[in-house]
Amino acid sequence: MKRFFLFLVVACLYVVTNAQVLVPTTWTAYGLTFEAPKGILIEEDTEDTFLLNSSRFYISVHSLESDDMKKEDLEDLLKGLADDDGVQKQSDIVTIDLEQFHGLYLKGIAEEDPCYYVCLMTKDAGSVFYVSIIYNRTDDKVVEKMLKSFKMEEE
């Protein structure tokens, strides 16, 4: 019985220490805000690129030319970006509908790490963003929370 309780305590501590706290993070150039792991380092915050890095996650966000782009173009764009980056074992493309964005994502393997590749288009078709999230553990639920948190700051 003591072993069972010891196991239970150790299991609870493992879950608590591995829980990932997410905090709002903003790409200042566009006012694009999303939940990112607490303590992640911002490596670049420019007009073109927003890069974040930690021991568990590498997040890259890019603004894309959106002239004449339609919602229907996102699937080919996403597939092309993932192919260009050599993403292996690509999943089917999944549609996500956020309050301010039309979006698509696919999961795959970038080199040896699991990844999500995402395209987001503002519903007014004014901006298109490409996001890649590479992580070193199969922590899909955390990444899915991040994906669902994307929003533009109100002006």
PLM regions: where:
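Short, surface-exposed coil-to-beta transition loops
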Residues: 45-47, 112-119, 130, 142-145
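Extracytoplasmic/secreted envelope proteins and their assembly/folding machinery
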Residues: 71-78, 143-147
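Signature of long, low-cysteine stretches enriched in small and polar/charged residues
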Residues: 38, 78-125
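Short, hydrophobic/aromatic-rich segments at coil-to-beta transitions
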Residues: 21-26, 48-49, 97-107
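Secretory pathway targeting signatures of secreted, lumenal, and periplasmic proteins
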Residues: 30-75, 109
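Sec-dependent N-terminal signal peptides
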Residues: 4-19
